[in-house]
Every structure is written in C-alpha cells, then in structure tokens.
C-alpha cells in the first residue's frame, strides 16, 4: 500500500499547509504514541514509553513541538524535550537513553517556511516501513484521549547538548587532537549552531564559527552545506586550514580546503574508504547512489573495493550497507554513513572522520583524493505538479533516448522525482561539460513541455 504521508525522509511540507499543520501534527503525535505504546516492549511490562523530541531553529518548531507533545501525552506517552539539536544527536540520545523513539522537527536543508517530522526507532535508526504504515493506519482512527491518570508527562532534557558533544568527540581518535588547525565551521543558522563549534574547539581547533545566529527565519539562507560559497569566502578571508559546512539539521556536510576548493560527499567517501584501507588493510565494499559520480565508482573498483548504487536517499544507502554488511556509504549531497561510528548520517562525526584521515596521513584533502577527477555533471531541478505523469511522456522519453544515443556509453542520464518536494531532477554526466549541459538542458526542456 502506498504511503500517504511519509516520504523518503519523514513527513515534510510547507508550514500551514497539509500535512504540516498543528492539527495534523497533534494527530500524528497521538497516532505514533498509540503505535509505540502498543509495542511488545511496553505492553508486556506495563511501563510507559518515553519519546525524545528535538528540533532545528525554524520559528514553526515551537508550534509543532507543542502539537507533538500534546499528541503523545494524549496517547499516554511521556515526552523529553531536547530543544534545538542536530538530527543525528536525537538518534544518538534515543539509543543512549534507551527511549522508545526519537522525533525530529526539521525540514533539513529546506527554507524556513518548510518544516517536517521524522522519527527514529529505539536503536537510533529510521523507522521501518511497516511501523510508518502502522502510524498511517492509526491516523485514520479517532483521537481518544487517555484517562487523566494515564496521560503522558513532559520534561526538558537539560544536558542534551553536552551528552551529544561528548559522543561526537568520542568518535575522534584519542591519539590525535586538532591543535594548530584553523577551522571555519558553518552551522547554517541551524540545529548545530551551539554544539558544533564546541566539538571542534574542545578537540583543540581554532574555530571560526559562521551561521550561528538563528532568528527563526534565516536557517539555510545563504549559508550552510547547500550554499557553500559563504564557507569558501570565510576560509579565504581568515586564511583557514579547512572549512566545514553543515545543513540545517546537521546530518550532511561539505568541506572546503585552504585553497577554497569544495569537496562533496562522493569525494569524501573515496577519501574515507582509502583511509580505512590504510588503517585496516581492506574494505570489502562501499555504497553510493544513482547520483554518485562515475569517477568515484571507477577509482574505488581500481582500489579493489566493490561499489553498489542505492536509490537516492540516505535511508536507501543504509539499507544497502546493512544488506551487504558494509560500513561506509554516502550521497554526493554530503550525507555520509559510517555505521561503526553512528547509526545515521552525522555531519559533525563525518567531519571528524575526514580530519582524522588528514591527521593520520599528514596529507591535504587534494593529496588524499589522489588525482581522482570527477566527470562533469549537470543537474537541473524542474518544478512540476505533484500529480504530473512524467513517466508516461513520449516527449521526455525521446529526449532521454537522444541524449543516451549521443553519449554512447561515455556518460549517464538519470531522471528521478524528489522524495521531499514536487521536483523532477534531471542529471546528465559526460566526459566534458558542454555535453553534460547540452543534454541536461534539452531533457529539462522536454520535462517542462510535458508537465506544463
């Protein structure tokens, strides 16, 4: 059965429009609470489950947090409130505190007027599809408030930030520190605005923080992992050794070196795999996505590392890692998974892995990349109606076929719908920039014509 509300990364939309309304989010909290309370772990022991709620810095977070809290309480579930906290921080704390679930109020890299709800299970992983389906089924049931003596209670988790900071630091090798390193950290005016600078500072770095003045409306606005030009400028202006940009909920990152050169998730995956080979002797395989640059796939295979492409979305990368029993995977957007460090993508932890690789090898990022040159890619996002039948369009099919014939196996065409917004992503990879741009634009034009 198709899911009505849950996408690839929870439930997301524009605030005030379905489903991101206070009324729906209250019902969502209630439905999730009923599903959790009915789980064997709690039903058999007769104990009350507790969930942890965190959020990013959007102004709507206050409203949605209150609605979720009310819904959980009505279902007889206790609530702990972490306040602004990176998504991976909620995943870690949920697992560390042995809670029933974690909930994050965030729309990640989207503008402030969007928001979303995502859930983590007790082990710090995203909810299984079957649990999301149970929550959607429960949403169809009437809300029946628990008796007064069974209502859930809410309290603040005052030391949430400190706990998460210590966890992040624990993933960095004890033999190393960051003394002597001038580091720009861009927190996107988002959830990591407080914790991220502390992590790197406490490890010894000279930290220059930017994007650390959230006002409820400026999250991801010209800063962060989706707008890395701000980081490039700051690195150059401050003559920094390295720059790290997180997104609004700090589950992804981009890295900039002293020369102002940007490294994406594909390149960082290659660097981390090579570092793991140097320290452990062998890496059996790694996971990318349909969007991963062909140059990285070829380079990994030449290093004796199997490479598997998952569907786009970190949950699908995670599924492939588990299926193969591997540790390292990434998306070009900067979601990096290292399952021996964390159960989910974590921008801060991933940055520490990159820094550890540099420390171990005493090499720059450019040296660690070892001459791997990415194939030119052109990505065009085409907005369309949510119900547009782009797959059945002959116009789009002909444009794709023409491009693939011209590339003749020396490139790739990838068309996919976004899982979080009404956008069709057109990506063409070719041996040269001109071909990538030409064929991406011709396909995008066909998409606009077919979905107008």
From Swiss-Prot:
The keyword Phosphoprotein applies. Gene3D superfamilies: Alpha-D-Glucose-1,6-Bisphosphate, subunit A, domain 3, Alpha-D-phosphohexomutase, C-terminal domain. Its cofactor is Mg(2+). GO terms for molecular function: magnesium ion binding; phosphoglucosamine mutase activity; phosphomannomutase activity. It catalyses: alpha-D-glucosamine 1-phosphate = D-glucosamine 6-phosphate. Pfam families: PGM_PMM_I, PGM_PMM_II, PGM_PMM_III, PGM_PMM_IV. Binds 1 Mg(2+) ion per subunit. Keywords: Isomerase, Magnesium, Metal-binding, Phosphoprotein. Its EC number is 5.4.2.10. GO terms for biological process: carbohydrate metabolic process; peptidoglycan biosynthetic process; UDP-N-acetylglucosamine biosynthetic process. The active site is at residue 108. The keyword Metal-binding applies. Transmembrane segments: none annotated. GO terms for cellular component: cytosol. PANTHER family: PHOSPHOGLUCOMUTASE (ALPHA-D-GLUCOSE-1,6-BISPHOSPHATE-DEPENDENT), PHOSPHOHEXOSE MUTASE. Belongs to the phosphohexose mutase family. This is Phosphoglucosamine mutase. The lineage of its organism: Bacteria, Pseudomonadati, Pseudomonadota, Betaproteobacteria, Burkholderiales.
């Amino acid at each position: 059965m198709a899911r009505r509300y849950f996408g690839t990364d929870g439930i997301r939309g524009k605030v005030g429009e379905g489903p991101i309304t206070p009324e729906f989010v209250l019902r969502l909290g209630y439905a999730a609470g009923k599903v959790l309370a009915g789980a064997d772990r709690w039903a058999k022991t007769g104990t009350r489950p507790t969930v942890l709620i965190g959020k990013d810095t959007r102004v709507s977070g206050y409203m949605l947090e209150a609605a979720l809290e009310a819904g959980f309480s009505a279902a007889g579930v206790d609530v702990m409130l972490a306040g602004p906290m990176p998504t991976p921080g909620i995943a870690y704390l949920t697992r560390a505190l042995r809670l029933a679930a974690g909930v994050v109020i965030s729309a990640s890299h989207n503008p402030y007027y969007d928001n979303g709800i995502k859930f983590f299970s007790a082990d710090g992983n995203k909810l299984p599809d079957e649990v999301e389906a149970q929550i959607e089924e429960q949403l169809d049931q009437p809300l029946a408030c628990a008796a007064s003596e069974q209502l859930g209670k809410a309290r603040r988790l005052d030391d949430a930030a400190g706990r998460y900071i210590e966890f992040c630091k624990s993933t960095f090798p004890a033999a190393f520190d960051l003394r002597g390193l001038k580091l720009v950290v861009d927190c996107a005016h988002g959830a990591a605005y407080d914790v991220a600078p502390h992590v790197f500072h406490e490890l010894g770095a000279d930290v220059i923080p930017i994007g650390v003045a959230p006002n409820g409306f400026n999250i991801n606005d010209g800063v962060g992992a989706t707008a890395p030009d701000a980081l490039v400028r700051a690195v150059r202006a401050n003559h920094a050794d390295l720059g790290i940009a997180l997104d609004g909920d700090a589950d992804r990152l981009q890295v900039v070196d002293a020369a102002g050169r940007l490294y994406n998730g594909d390149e960082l995956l290659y660097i981390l795999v090579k570092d793991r080979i140097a320290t452990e002797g062998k890496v059996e395989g790694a996971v990318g996505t349909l969007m991963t640059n062909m140059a990285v796939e070829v380079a990994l295979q030449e290093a004796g590392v199997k490479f598997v492409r998952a569907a786009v979305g970190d949950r699908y990368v995670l599924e492939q890692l588990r299926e193969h029993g591997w540790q390292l995977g990434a998306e070009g957007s900067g979601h990096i998974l290292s399952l021996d460090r964390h159960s989910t993508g974590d921008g801060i932890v991933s940055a520490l892995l990159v820094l550890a690789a540099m420390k171990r090898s005493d090499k720059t990022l450019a040296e660690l990349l070892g001459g791997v040159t990415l194939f030119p890619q052109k990505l065009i996002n085409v907005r369309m109606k949510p119900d547009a039948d782009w797959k059945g369009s002959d116009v789009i099919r002909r444009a794709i076929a023409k491009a693939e014939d011209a590339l003749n196996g020396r490139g790739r065409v990838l068309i996919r719908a976004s899982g979080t917004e009404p956008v069709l992503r057109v990506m063409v990879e070719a041996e040269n920039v001109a071909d990538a741009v030409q064929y991406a634009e011709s396909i995008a034009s066909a998409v606009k014509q077919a979905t107008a």
